[in-house]
């Protein structure tokens, strides 16, 4: 059986070998570290001991601590990638993360500028023709 901490180190090395960005490696590393800390509190030391219920409980704990559904979804992405890696490496036979669904979250429509904000933005760029042209394109096309 593979200890969680050892699997975590191998996963980070795997991400580096796949040329993932530094920010991805850091984010996934911290997310998996957070998961492992939670699993350790639950007396889970090896990758084969982790269940889908453990992962769900981890996400519920984070939600109770104020994490948004979007943040939980990102952490679940890291977890799913980690467990896919473990399965490919044959450290586990079943992937418990594949049984966990992403939390639903609402996407808010973009905020529309008020007429005053619209005028202020145009006035701020009045002295620079290039910036004024860029702002006009943004304002007239609705590009975000």
Where are these regions (language model features)?
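Conserved catalytic core of the tyrosine transesterase superfamily
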Residues: 1-144
